[in-house]
Curated annotation (Swiss-Prot):
This is Small ribosomal subunit protein eS4. Residues 44-107 form the S4 RNA-binding domain. The keyword Ribonucleoprotein applies. InterPro entries: Rib_uL2_dom2, Ribosomal_eS4, Ribosomal_eS4_central_region, Ribosomal_eS4_central_sf, Ribosomal_eS4_KOW, Ribosomal_eS4_N, Ribosomal_eS4_N_CS, S4_RNA-bd. PANTHER family: 30S/40S RIBOSOMAL PROTEIN S4 (PTHR11581), SMALL RIBOSOMAL SUBUNIT PROTEIN ES4 (PTHR11581:SF0). Belongs to the eukaryotic ribosomal protein eS4 family. Keywords: Ribonucleoprotein, Ribosomal protein, RNA-binding, rRNA-binding. The keyword Zinc does not apply. It comes from Ignicoccus hospitalis (strain KIN4/I / DSM 18386 / JCM 14125).
Length: 255
């Protein structure tokens, strides 16, 4: 997906990401997401999500009022900024309506809210972008949505507590507490969803990883539920389960 410029405070509708469900010629300007957990080209501002995607408001004024009143939670926390960027795997709660959604990569539409129940809304799967050693010798996992998870180690010279967690692996956590529930390595045999590119939203089992120089040069061979083989790059692969997906998926995406 083409990158949207980040230097200006305003965003013209014609320059907005193609998957935003807004009328391009109805007005000149669109809400520009603030810098946050997801890049502009992979996210949607909270106002557009509430008004144009979920349909909880008819106008910008109504959507901003709902958000300002604390009626919308993202990953278990109230978000009152109508420019807050919402992206892949984020959990949305409509406070008082007992309605929950997970933002899922989806073919053509790129990113859609999928209805989930209250129990499912307590967990979120994230991708490990990198891991670093911090003060005290502990290990910090930096995730795709901007959050950090600290793995405390007893012996910094031999951090066995953090050894299993690798870059590009999937980490199932509770939200908002960030308690680790499960881990899915980026390796052959696991189930993954494609988060971007022409195969966005496709789910399959990883059959082969052909290493290259960097994520965008590493080719991944996958096989979907219809026994069709497709290829993408490691940068777009998001592990979500070993034998079965750890989260609910759209009907027909997997078994």
């Amino acid at each position: 997906m083409a990158r949207v410029g980040g230097g200006k405070r305003h965003l013209k509708r014609l320059a907005a990401p193609a998957f935003w469900p807004i009328h391009r010629k109805e007005a000149v300007w669109a809400v520009k997401p603030r810098p946050g957990p997801h890049p502009i080209e992979e996210s949607i501002p909270l106002l557009i999500l509430v008004r144009d995607v979920l349909g909880y408001a008819e106008t910008s004024r109504e959507a901003r009022k709902l958000i300002a009143e604390g009626r919308i939670k993202v990953d278990g926390r109230v978000r009152k900024d109508y420019k807050f960027p919402v992206g892949a795997m984020d959990v949305i709660e409509i406070v008082g309506a007992d309605e929950y959604y997970r933002m899922i990569p989806y073919p053509v539409k790129y990113l859609v809210p999928m209805r989930i129940d209250a129990e499912e809304a307590k967990k979120k799967i994230c991708r490990i972008e990198n891991k670093v050693t911090v003060k005290g010798g502990h290990v910090q996992l930096n995730l795709h949505d901007g959050r950090n998870v600290l793995i405390r180690v007893e012996d910094p010279r031999n951090p066995v507590e953090a050894q299993e967690y690798k870059t590009l692996g999937g980490l199932l956590i509770t939200v908002p507490e960030q308690e680790i529930l499960d881990y899915v390595p980026f390796e052959e045999g696991v189930i993954a969803i494609v988060k971007s590119g022409r195969n966005v939203g496709r789910v399959g089992r990883i059959e082969e990883i052909v290493k290259g120089m960097g994520r965008k040069k590493t080719l991944v061979k996958m096989r979907d539920v219809h026994d069709e083989v497709f290829y993408t790059v490691a940068e777009y692969v998001f592990p979500i389960g070993k034998e079965e997906p750890l989260i609910k998926l759209p009907e027909g995406a997997w078994k």
